[in-house]
Curated annotation (Swiss-Prot):
Keyword rRNA processing listed: no
GO molecular function: ATP binding; DNA binding
Source organism of the structure: Pasteurella multocida (strain Pm70)
Name of the protein described by the UniProt record: Chromosome partition protein MukB
GO CC annotation terms, alphabetical: cytoplasm; nucleoid
Xref: PANTHER family: CHROMOSOME PARTITION PROTEIN MUKB, DUF4476 DOMAIN-CONTAINING PROTEIN
ATP-binding keyword on record: yes
Chain residues that bind ATP: 60-67
Oligomer status and interactors: Homodimerization via its hinge domain. Binds to DNA via its C-terminal region. Interacts, and probably forms a ternary complex, with MukE and MukF via its C-terminal region. The complex formation is stimulated by calcium or magnesium. Interacts with tubulin-related protein FtsZ.
Primary localization class, coarse: cytoplasm
Lineage of source species: Bacteria, Pseudomonadati, Pseudomonadota, Gammaproteobacteria, Pasteurellales
Length: 1495
């Protein structure tokens, strides 16, 4: 609440509420209501009432708040505003239409709560309640929201949960959201419910209410029970509908009946659908057949007409094209002749130019011949001068070498003479010893100094001069050896270098300037070709003669080829070789003979061809008659191949496949029968396990009913699935036993039994309280050991399929049903396969009987096509005969002209056949060119190559180290001169050594030396004179040789210059001047002159032919115009029909019906026959579609022959209409044609299958009667058990209360009729037009004609008759005083007796609900039991004590309201006193315990 309210004074309960423990049949304790909390109610701001485990009494005066407290409890229990209506027992004239139901006035403004604190069998604390709040307005509405709280500690006070303390005297009521936050903070679970159904489902699952309240009717029953308890008495609302309260609805049996009836209904509907489908099949066949005939005949008639128009158009087009071809050929010939005339004119001009060129060429050849003679003379001169020039050059070189040697010798002699003269002069000055001694001494000293200077020896002296002299002498000797070696190497290199240079110069002279490194390779090339060139040069004259001869033959061949070309052009042939010419000549010779013979043969051949054409026409007609039947056979064969998925090449394949189908059918039939047997076994097993008590033997049920007992399996029908194997093994073979109350009473009946199992077990016991503790058993891992007696043990294993426990049977039933469904599906598939095989075999049998003889014969249409082709060829041949004669005459004229040309060509055939002549001419010409080039080369360089040949090998190694060797030699000479000068200086000192000591002896020696020098000087002077004379002689010789060489060189250059000029002039002329050139040029000129005259004659002939062709072109143009006009007229017809035909083709192909319409067998019918067929089909279709507006309109539109596409649209409409009528639950295809085929296969199978299914699904009237009796018996036993708890109840004069269950007489008659064998009633259950519910309703009406059924249908009445509750009358009776057992009615009982009796009835209802709900609630949950009683003052103290004893015995809580003068001795009593303090009002509560006992 938003405002704060004063907190009421809460008095503590003076005595604690006792906790009484009750023993229950179940092991779990029963749930209890712990307290009731009211927040912000009228008079109660925050009050919690702790509830006693037995009786809680609210004591107080009028208006103390007792009814308000009970209203809060009921509101928390059933928060449904459509049901809540609080009034007291004194309220009169209260109606349900009152706006205020009593709840709005009991609340205060703001948030209000009504909550119940409970603890269930699981020791879980659960607080459930409702948040209430007044809604402003005149309607006095109340807003209710339900919630639950779980997980709170038991010590938590409910009052503190819903309020928030502000101070010591004030508190605030929490809103629902604040309450949720507070609970979540405390760690508990808060849940709000948006529907009363969810709220009650939670209360049921947790054991707060005894019954699951699924709907508003269930809530209404619960509220009426509470209301009846609250106000007391025997409630007529409950007693009138006591069956609904006490007897549970047998949903399983009812649903089983409904499922079976639904299956039967569906089965019968399917059978009706099959019958409709069979009618549809006939309709399909009729519509498809007539529509196909109607549309396909018109389709093929238009196709035939279109084909005929196209053939006519093609024929006209061929005539047109043939005329155009002739025109084209004529124009082509005109063009060719025009081109030929132009070419001839052009050739004529060209030949004139060529003829003039030939004349000019002859002049050039003559001029070239004159130049060639000069060239030959100059070439001879040049060759001669070249040879002399080479010889003279060698002479000059030899003279040059000799001159150089002489000059060297003269220079050496001059040097020696000068040295001797110098020595003589030196010695001449020292002749006088006295005069020269000092001079000699000084000279010796000077020589010594000079030696020191030259030798670079500072320590040189007289003593060591000899040693130094020896050293320098040895050095000079080694240098001399080195110089000699270098001189030797120089001489060798000088010779090699001279030969290499000479050879290199020769190579450069021939090949031009080339690198020294490639000189040898070039020399090898030149020398390799040199012998061949010499041979070629020698053959030049022979080659010229050969070339002249070949050119003459070639000119003759060209003349023959031109003649052959002219012949080919005129004869319009392309003969290239002699063989062809000879063959053509023979052909032309035979042509004249053959023409006459061929003309005579044509008559005979024409008659033969005409006879053959007639035979082919007869054969064509035979095949045309056979073609429709063959096409029909092929269509049937294709259908069989499509159906079977096989390809048949011949009739043997068909027969083999039929045999294989028979084998396959037998195998499938065996599989189908096996599956049917397996299915029957499964259904039998399912039927046995589906019995309500699980009995597999129906005789046991009869015996149990006869003995008044119950099957043991029925007693254990509710055991859990995990305990079922244990109990089944516990009883072993006795699990099929019958539990009876008295064995002695049954023993007398055993001898009279006729139908009885081999072993019948009877167990004495109370079926209502049967206990298995009499058996001594021990449970093992896989079974149970039972001590039967002291000397007998029985061990029973746990069965896989336990008899006990509905849950175990249902689980196994699910597996069996799934297995049965799988087997049923497989059986249906095998049955379908069998039907398919049978149908396929039937189709094959029909095919063998009707079409096998034709199906595998050759295609008549292919044969007809071949015949037509042969006929066309014959027609062409006959047409050719017409033109052959004219062609032969033309050939004869041509042949004569050709023979004249051939006579000219025949002698020259060998020449024409010589194809290699031109090659040989070219080859010879090339050889001559090469020979002439070689001849010129040999003339120019023959002598040079002769000189090069012996010394060419010197070019292999280039003496390129010669210069370095020369440098080394000069260096060695220089070193030798230096060493010799030093040695000479040392020798001079050594010679002057004696001057230092022996002056006289030296003088004597000098004199001798002087004489020797003079003698040597004279000898050298003589030698010098001789050398000078020789040198002068060699110089004169060299001058003469050199002059001759220069003269030869000048002459060679002049000759070569003139030769080059002549060669250049000949080259500029561009002709070859050989011996036959002049003759060839003259022959060429004469030939061109002849060709020119022939060309002029041909041109005149061609111009005449052109004039003739132009005159024939006019008649050909008129023929072309006529043919074109006929073709275009026919083509317009084809094009006009093509538009609608394209629409027809597009529709047929787009809708996939072209194959249905293109009936090839109709192509052989005439237009009248097809039109007649279409008209007949149209009449049949008008009748067939008279009831279908859409098809009737489509058919009417299709009758317009100007639009054939409408017929295709009608076919598509029929096709679509039939496709929509296909039963997809039976036929798995969209194609009506295939649907017809599948119908044939499927309908018979489905009919048999559904007939068998209906027989199995059919509900037996006897079985229904047995089920009803069994269910009634079970409920009678249950009511009997409930009566046991009411036997000792006494209220006033009422000593006992009981429930009486009786079967209505009308319904008993019905059960007897159902289980009887009266034939008069069997017509109702064998009528397949009625369901079982309708049949049982009809039977009820027959048995009870006096009962008015009202407006209810038979189906509704039958469904009510399948509910066992409608068979029973349930009444409450009391045993009262001397009256005995009386029907419990309020008028016959006092108020207290009525209240006690009504409370007893309510306890029976609650207990019945608990038993009914035990199967769907947790096994460890025992629900709370609590009833109300307002105004308990209507009962006396003894009745109240009896009520308290009943509560204690049934472990039930009771909440009563009593005035202040009522003080129960047991339970908890709350004293309620309403107090008013100022403007505030509250109820003062004091709790007491049993104060009456202490008074």
């Amino acid at each position: 609440m938003s405002e704060e309210l004063a907190l009421e004074n809460l008095e503590h309960v003076e005595t604690s509420v006792p906790h009484t423990v009750f023993s229950h049949a179940n092991s779990a304790p029963r749930g209890k209501f712990r307290s009731l909390t009211l927040i912000n109610w009228n008079g109660f701001f925050a009050r919690t009432f702790d509830l006693d485990e037995l009786v809680t009494t609210l004591s107080g005066g009028n208006g103390a708040g007792k009814s308000t407290t009970m209203a809060g409890f009921v509101t928390a229990l059933i928060p449904d505003l459509t049901l809540l209506h609080f009034r007291n027992t004194t309220e009169a004239g209260a109606t349900s239409g009152s706006r205020d139901k009593g709840l709005h006035g009991k609340l205060r403004p703001g948030v209000c709560y009504a909550a119940l604190d409970t603890i269930n069998s699981r020791n879980q604390r659960v607080i459930v309640g409702a948040r209430l709040q007044q809604v402003a307005g005149r309607d006095k509405k109340v807003d209710i929201k339900t919630f639950s709280i779980q997980g709170l500690n038991l010590a938590e006070n409910p009052t503190t949960i819903f309020t928030d303390v502000v101070n010591e005297r004030q508190a605030r009521v929490l809103t629902l959201n604040e309450l949720k936050e507070k609970i979540e903070q405390a760690g508990a679970q808060f849940k709000q419910y948006h529907s009363i159904t969810d709220y009650h489902a939670m209360m049921f699952d947790l054991g707060i209410i005894p019954k699951r309240l699924r709907s508003s009717s269930d809530r209404s029953k619960f509220y009426k029970l509470i209301e009846a308890s609250l106000y007391g008495g025997i409630s007529s609302a409950i007693t009138r509908s006591l069956r609904d309260y006490l007897l549970p609805e047998n949903l399983g049996v009812r649903k089983a009946f409904q499922d079976m009836e639904s299956a039967l209904r569906e089965n019968r509907m399917t059978l009706e659908a099959i019958k409709v489908t069979q009618a549809d099949r006939d309709l399909f066949k009729h519509l498809i057949t007539e529509t196909s005939n109607y549309v396909a005949s018109d389709y093929m008639r238009h196709a035939n007409e279109r084909r005929g128009n196209i053939e006519s158009a093609v024929r006209f087009r061929q005539d047109w094209y043939r005329a155009r071809t002739e025109q084209h050929l004529s124009q082509q010939r005109l063009v060719e002749l025009s081109r030929e005339a132009a070419e001839l004119a052009e050739n004529e001009k060209t030949l004139e130019v060529d003829h003039q060129s030939a004349v000019d060429y002859l002049n050039l050849v003559l001029n070239a011949l004159r130049h060639q003679e000069k060239i030959a003379r100059y070439q001879d001169d040049v060759a001669e001068i070249t040879a002399r020039l080479e010889e003279q050059k060698m002479v000059v070189e030899t003279a040059t070498e000799q001159l150089e040697e002489s000059q060297v010798q003269v220079e050496q002699v001059e040097q020696e003479v000068d040295q001797i003269r110098a020595q003589l002069a030196d010695y001449q000055q020292a002749l006088d010893a006295q005069q020269t001694r000092a001079l000699q001494y000084q000279q010796a000293i000077a020589a010594l100094e000079k030696a020191k200077t030259l030798c670079g020896l500072a320590d040189l002296g007289v003593k060591n001069v000899e040693a130094y002299h020896d050293e320098f002498a040895a050095h000079a000797e080694s240098l001399t050896e080195q110089v000699l070696e270098l001189e030797q190497r120089m001489s060798i290199s000088d010779a090699a270098k001279s030969q290499f240079d000479k050879a290199y110069q020769l190579v450069c002279k021939v090949a031009g300037e080339i690198p020294r490194s490639t000189a040898f390779e070039q020399a090898k090339v030149l020398l390799r070709d040199y012998p061949t060139q010499k041979v070629q040069a020698q053959q030049t004259s022979q080659l010229r003669a050969k070339l002249h001869e070949l050119e003459q033959r070639y000119a003759q061949q060209q003349s023959a080829v031109r003649l052959l070309k002219e012949f080919n052009q005129r004869a319009n042939v392309s003969l290239e070789d002699a063989e062809a010419l000879e063959a053509y000549h023979a052909e032309q010779e035979a042509l004249l003979e053959d023409v006459s013979a061929e003309l005579s043969e044509q008559v005979e051949q024409r008659s033969t061809l005409r006879q053959k054409r007639e035979q082919l026409s007869a054969l064509y007609q035979d095949n045309a008659k056979k073609a429709p039947a063959w096409l029909t056979a092929q269509a049937a064969l294709e259908r069989l191949q499509d159906q079977s998925g096989e390809t048949f090449a011949d009739s043997q394949d068909v027969m083999q496949f039929m045999q294989a189908q028979l084998v396959k059918e037998r195998e499938l039939t065996i599989e189908r029968d096996q599956l049917e047997q397996q299915r029957q076994q499964l259904e039998a097993q399912i039927s046995r396990l589906s019995q309500p008590d699980g009995s597999e033997d129906a005789r046991l049920n009869v015996l149990a009913e006869r003995f008044g007992g119950v099957l043991l399996s029925e007693l254990y029908d509710d055991v859990p699935i995990e305990d079922a194997p244990y109990f089944s093994a516990l009883y072993g073979p006795a699990r099929h036993a019958i539990v009876v109350r008295d064995l002695d009473a049954v023993k007398g009946q055993l001898a009279q039994l006729e139908e009885c199992p081999d072993d019948l077990y009877l167990i004495e016991g109370d079926p209502t309280a049967f206990d298995d503790s009499v058996l001594s058993a021990q449970e093992l891992a896989h079974g149970v050991v039972v001590q039967v007696s002291d000397r007998e043990l029985r061990y029973s294993k746990f069965p896989e399929i336990p008899l006990f426990g509905r849950a175990a049977r249902e689980q196994y039933l699910e597996a069996l049903q799934q297995q049965r469904d799988d087997v049923t599906e497989q059986h249906a598939q095998r049955a379908f396969d069998v039907q398919k095989c049978q149908r396929l075999h039937e189709h094959f049998s029909q095919f063998v009987g009707l079409h096998l003889a034709l199906a595998f014969q050759p295609n008549p249409e292919d044969v007809m096509a071949e015949i037509q082709q042969q006929r066309n060829e014959i027609e062409r041949e006959l047409n050719q005969f017409v033109t052959t004669e004219q062609q032969l005459r033309i050939q004869l004229d041509y042949a004569k002209e050709k023979m004249q040309l051939l006579n000219k060509l025949i002698p020259q055939l060998n020449l024409i056949a010589d194809e290699s002549l031109i090659d040989r001419v070219e080859e010879c010409r090339e050889q001559l060119d090469i020979a002439e080039q070689d001849e010129l080369f040999i003339r120019q360089y023959g002598a040079t190559l002769s000189q090069l040949e012996p010394i060419a090998n010197t070019l292999q190694s280039d003496p390129e180290h010669y210069e370095r060797l020369k440098a080394d030699y000069e260096q060695a000479i220089s070193q030798q001169k230096q060493v010799q000068q030093r040695l000479f200086a040392l020798a001079d000192v050594l010679q002057r050594k004696a001057h230092f000591a022996y002056e006289e002896r030296v003088q004597t020696e000098n004199t001798d030396l002087n004489e020797q020098l003079r003698a040597k000087l004279d000898s050298l002077q003589q030698q010098r004179e001789v050398q000078k004379a020789q040198l002068q002689q060699k110089q004169q010789q060299f001058t003469n040789y050199n002059r001759v060489y220069i003269e030869l060189q000048t002459s060679f250059n002049n000759k070569m210059q003139m030769l080059q000029e002549l060669l250049q002039e000949v080259g500029e002329l561009g002709v070859r001047a050989d011996q036959g050139a002049e003759e060839r040029a003259k022959q060429r000129r004469d030939e061109l002159h002849q060709v020119l005259s022939d060309t002029r004659q041909r041109r005149h002939y061609v111009e005449k032919q052109l004039t003739l062709i132009e005159s024939e072109a006019q008649s050909l143009n008129a023929r072309i115009r006529k043919a074109e006009r006929d073709y275009k007229t026919q083509r317009e017809l084809v094009v006009a029909a093509k538009v609608s035909w394209c629409v027809v083709m597009r529709l047929s192909r787009g809708s996939d019906v072209e194959k249905r319409l293109n009936r090839r067998e109709f192509a052989y019918l005439s237009a009248d026959e097809l039109r007649s067929m279409s008209d007949k089909a149209l009449g049949a279709l008008r009748t067939a579609v008279a009831d279908n507006e859409y098809l009737r309109d489509s058919l009417r539109l299709s009758e317009d022959n100007r639009k054939p596409e409408n017929k295709v649209r009608f076919f598509i409409a029929v096709y679509q209409h039939l496709r929509e009528r296909i039963r997809q639950d039976i036929i798995k295809t969209d194609d009506p044609i295939d649907a017809i085929e599948q119908m044939e296969i499927e309908l018979s199978r489905l009919t048999d299958e559904l007939t068998r299914r209906e027989q199995k699904l059919a509900i037996s009237s006897e079985s229904v009667a047995n089920i009803m009796r069994k269910t009634i018996q079970r409920e009678q036993n249950r009511i009997r058990m409930l009566n046991q708890g009411l036997q000792n109840i006494a209220f006033g004069q009422v000593k006992s209360v009981r429930l009486v269950v009786n079967i209505r007489d009308t319904h008993a008659m019905l059960l007897d009729a159902l289980s009887g064998t009266q034939e008069e009633y069997q017509d109702l259950f064998t009528d397949q037009r009625m369901t079982f519910s309708e049949a049982i309703a009809k039977l009820y009406q027959r048995l009870n004609p006096h009962i008015d059924m009202g407006q209810r249908t038979a189906q509704t009445i039958g469904e009510e008759l399948l509910d066992y509750r409608n068979y029973l009358d349930l009444e409450v009776e009391v045993y009262r005083g001397a009256d005995g057992w009386l029907r419990a009615e309020s008028g016959a009982l006092s108020t207290g007796e009525a209240i006690g009796t009504g409370m007893s009835i309510l306890l029976m209802v609650v207990q019945s609900w608990e038993e009914e709900s035990r199967r769907i609630r947790g096994k460890d949950i025992v629900p709370c039991r609590l009833l109300f009683l307002d105004e308990a003052a209507r009962l006396d103290a003894k009745s109240i004590s009896t009520l308290f004893e009943l509560c204690e015995r049934l472990d039930m809580q009771l909440l009563i309201a009593a005035p202040e003068n009522i003080s129960p001795e047991k339970g908890t009593t709350y004293k309620l006193v309403r107090k008013i303090a100022g403007n505030q009002e509250h109820v003062h509560v004091v709790g007491l315990r049993g104060f009456g006992a202490t008074a």
